[in-house]
Regions:
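Cyclophilin-like peptidyl-prolyl cis-trans isomerases
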Residues: 21-24, 383, 387-391, 398-633
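Amphipathic alpha-helical scaffolding segments comprising HEAT/armadillo-like alpha-solenoid repeats
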Residues: 24-28, 50-63, 82-94, 113-126, ...
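Acidic carboxylate motifs that coordinate Ca2+ or other divalent cations, activating on Asp/Glu
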Residues: 97, 195, 293
Length: 633
């Protein structure tokens, strides 16, 4: 017998955020009721079994007498993503306690086994609790089957659940590539729904890569919907991405309009991706260099790079670089473009103006010099290898060594490189790279006694010691210290002072205890201080936390488990970066600019921006964390 439905639509924002949450400056907690984890030994045991990936031990707790334990065990199994746990989880969809049913639905969705489709659909038809229903709807979106699309399209939902339906169908088609005409037609029709939250949820499908082939032949309806939108409508950000992927000349004017006039910076940045710098859109891209949003400017500069620009634009690019000495990410793109245009003197003058010890500027300088051949660039790389900054000197010496690997076929270059390596051999920060260069067979006949250098002072740079064994930063990375977490509390904050301002992150201890412990420990020990945002993709995310190499390639010597949580990847959510698979997280994390549903099954969401989202929207590559402070809460 069908149960009467209870609850309020507010749970949808917590579960999906598929509506007005998109533009919110901060988010509520995940919506999962507190279960007293930090003071409950039985619940802590479940978490520890999860970290050990003891599937049998966790499954056994699904039969526990206490509903809190059953629920915690169900949620923990989500991070295993093990299909063999589906048989044990499915009966919990009919548990007497709503929290257990909710966490079981969440886990089945994150596991994503298509065999769960029928059970989820049947549970949705009978479920009364609003929170459980929202998780059932979301879980169906991860089933990657046409049957899941059929169930979502035919489900008898309340009006306030329509955004959840559109969101899950968008995920089915856009993330998993489920080809279903009914799904496509529903989402196209819903693009012009009067409710902006439903419109936004449906539009996300058209911005996801896997969905393009399903709707490309019906693009006329997408264009009509976009043309009907107000310039402030956030749904446009997804449609302009989809149309940009089609690369159809019919859309060039349309994309130019949104790139120049959209009120949401994310829409303007997305529209830039579809503009061709070889055509009439070049003026739109050039004009965007004056956009008030730094990330729109960055997107425009990236679009300009590589284009055959007219030489008349050179003075404009020069003026921009000169007038924005601290906008290094954009300057990097424009300097690369100038190098490609053979404006060598301009680029070298910028490099020559780099002050000794300016690590951030040298990062750009060394990259830009890679586009310039010959002695002029090599002499400047050698200068960087003698910089007071150990990090700059070590990196420059490695850059010089890599250049040698590419130039060694040219006999004319041998004398130059030999002299450069010989000059650097006595500098302990550059001596490893210099020695490797001098040991090249091309220099075997030269009179130079490398053996005599054995008594040279021991090198101290990162480049020298990185091959030596060292203790991991967190030797007990897979062990939870519950006393430490109780000291942090259920809602601690991580306050990031950045080069653009203050960002405060609220952390979700109860759902991602190991992750919160890891990040808090690293912050308390000062490891995040001075670390740059090495990767920023406009309207996707800003990533930081490489405490070793600072460029995204560093590995701190430990990994931690993935902890999938019920916090959705909406704008302002903080997630752990990984090495491309579950259970490979370490120190790096990212903050999202907008909804990113494709991250749900592979990344730990462990906090959100409680204040300072306006600062996050200013962050560019090479901006940095000046300090990171943990505040218990």
């Amino acid at each position: 017998m069908r149960r009467p439905r209870l609850g309020l639509a507010v749970v949808l924002c917590a579960t999906f955020g598929a509506a007005g949450c998109e533009a919110a400056p901060s988010l509520p907690s995940s919506g999962r009721p507190a279960d007293g984890l930090l003071d409950d030994a039985e619940l802590q045991t479940v978490v520890e079994l999860g970290i050990q990936r003891d599937i049998d031990g966790v499954v056994e707790r699904l039969l526990a007498e206490r509903p809190e334990v059953r629920a915690r065990a169900a949620m923990t199994l989500a991070s295993f993503q093990a299909a063999e746990s589906v048989v044990a989880l499915s009966p919990l969809l009919d548990d007497a306690e709503a929290q257990v049913r909710r966490d079981a639905a969440f886990a089945l969705g994150r596991i994503g086994d298509p065999g769960s489709t029928g059970a989820l659909g049947a549970a949705l038809a009978e479920e009364a609790d609003a929170g459980v229903r929202s998780h059932l709807i979301e879980a169906l979106g991860h089933m990657a089957t046409e049957r899941a699309a059929d169930l979502l399209l035919s489900a008898d939902l309340e009006s306030w659940e329509e955004a959840a339906r559109a969101s899950s169908l968008s995920v089915l088609g856009g993330v998993y590539g489920v080809s279903h005409e009914g799904l496509r037609d529903y989402l196209i029709e819903t693009l012009t729904h009067e409710d902006p939250s439903i419109r936004l949820a449906a539009s996300s499908f058209f911005g996801l890569q896997s969905g393009v082939r399903l709707w490309a032949r019906h693009a006329i309806y997408v264009r009509q919907a976009l043309d009907s939108y107000d310039l402030a409508d956030p749904a446009a950000m997804h449609l302009v991405v989809g149309l940009a992927r089609l690369d159809d000349f019919l859309d060039y004017g349309r994309l130019s309009r949104w790139a120049a006039q959209a009120q949401d910076w994310r829409t303007r940045a997305n529209a830039m991706s579809g503009l061709n710098p070889l055509g009439s859109a070049v003026q739109v891209l050039v004009d965007a260099l004056a956009d008030p949003s730094p990330l729109v400017v960055f997107a425009a500069a990236r679009a300009l790079t590589g284009g055959a620009l007219d030489d008349s634009l050179v003075p404009l690019l020069e003026r921009w670089i000169e007038g924005h000495p601290n906008r290094l990410a954009v300057s990097r793109e424009l300097l690369i473009q100038l190098a490609l245009m053979r404006q060598i003197d301009v680029v070298l003058a910028w490099v020559d103006a780099t002050a000794p010890g300016d690590e951030r500027r040298w990062v750009v300088g060394l990259e830009v010099l890679s586009y310039i051949p010959g002695q002029e660039s090599l002499s400047r790389i050698a200068r960087a290898a003698r910089d007071p900054s150990e990090r700059t000197a070590a990196e420059a010496s490695l850059v010089l060594l890599r250049r040698w690997q590419g130039d060694r076929q040219s006999a004319e270059a041998h004398d130059l490189y030999f002299d450069l390596f010989r000059e650097l051999i006595d500098d302990p920060r550059a001596s490893v790279a210099a020695r490797q260069g001098l040991e090249s067979p091309e220099f075997a006949v030269r009179s130079f006694d490398l053996a005599a250098l054995g008594a040279t002072s021991a090198p101290t740079s990162e480049a020298q010691v990185k091959d030596e064994p060292s203790l991991p930063l967190l030797p007990d990375a897979q062990t939870i210290d519950w006393g430490f977490l109780r000291g942090l509390g259920n809602a601690p904050s991580l306050v990031l002072e950045t080069t653009r301002g203050t960002v405060t992150l609220q952390l979700l201890t109860a759902e991602a205890p190991l992750t919160v412990q890891t990040v808090a420990r690293l912050a308390l020990d000062g490891h995040y201080d001075g670390v740059p945002f090495h990767r920023v993709l406009p309207n996707f995310m800003a990533q930081t936390g490489d405490i070793v190499a600072r460029d995204g390639t560093g590995e701190p010597g430990f990994t931690i488990r993935t902890e999938l949580t019920q916090l959705p990847f909406e704008a302002g959510v903080v997630g752990m970066a990984n090495l491309g698979s579950l259970d490979s997280e370490n120190s790096q994390f990212f903050i999202t600019h907008s909804r990113q549903p494709h991250l749900a099954r592979g990344f730990t969401a462990f906090g959100w921006v409680s204040s300072g989202m306006d600062v996050v929207d200013l962050l560019e590559p090479l901006d940095a964390i000046l300090s990171a402070t943990v505040v218990p809460g």
